[in-house]
Amino acid sequence: MFYEIMHRESCVAQLSTTGECRVCLEDFMPYDLVLVESDDFDERINNVTNFYYWCASRMLTLDRTYAKEILNSIGASQSVTDRERAQIALSYHCLSLLDVFWVKEENEKIRFEDINLFAHSLSNALVDIALRGHQMTVTNAHLLANDLSTGGLYPKAWVRKEDGFYLYKDGGREAVEREVLASKICRCFDCHQVLYEQGMFENEPVSISKIMTSQRYSLVTYAAYDVYCTNHDWNTLDKILELDAPGYYMMNILDYLVGNTDRHWENWGLLVDNETNQPIRLHDLMDFNRAFQQYDTPEGANCLTVGKRHLSQKDAAVEAVRNIGLNQVRQVEHTVFSEHPAWKATFEERLRVLRDAM
């Protein structure tokens, strides 16, 4: 059997279950999927392994809170291999709200415009399962996709409203409070960023943000881009600085100022133009529910975005302001720290450090 890996309505590659492969549109391949046209047995095995791993990555992660309940709700096993998880993802064509890739079987009569999640509703039941861990039947399980698995350990789900999709993130009152407060601070700086507001779901606080992807723009994680760069013998950070140095430096500045210690390689990356499958800049800065951690000193934690270098968050932020300045557009209102006076003192100290470094 052959699978066709699709980018919107175009077939970018065909792959058999034995690893025979034909790449049709190399420039439109997923960044983190490596397929090789070869008669070599080992390379064909690698093709199959890479394909199933890629499909599985578009499935929910098993260490996610409530993940077992979500699996149960679509009738899946509680302990599944990459291949089994891939089969679950393939059952709904590996659809996602993060990009426009999908998979179909050869000669299967189906179009992206008929099934894509940007134009077709998600069941409200999926929201309930993802956020609250309820056990219920999902009648349109084929619409469950990577949008319930946006990375990280916190329960989250997309909710469709009249003006588009919104991400609801749970994780407890403290995590929500940290994310919303960090967002209020970051808005005082010139940077592409996701705006987080506080809301409620079943009488529990959630942070709410609007989707940044669409049928025109996709998100590619740093992890995926690193795979792509490695296979081209490029230095990933060099390519990112070449593409969007201001966005990269502002990320390091803001993560330092708000004490965000969780900037791992799945929650930053590229915004890609789906017309060309080429990156245009770093995607909007997101994920602040681990902000205000290791926030009792000016140094901060180790910076996770500087490759093999060993820098503190302070050192990375100082380096950043010396390259692009602070880019503060308005003062941070003191009232945002009304419930956390200690955080206010640390923020002001860190802001002073950066101003003095300019």
Which functions belong to the PLM regions below?
Residues 261:
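Glycine-rich phosphate-binding P-loop
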Residues 264, 269-272:
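Conserved protein-kinase catalytic-loop segment immediately C-terminal to the catalytic Asp
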Residues 1-253, 257-258, 271-358:
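Phosphate/dinucleotide-binding and metal-coordinating scaffold of catalytic cores
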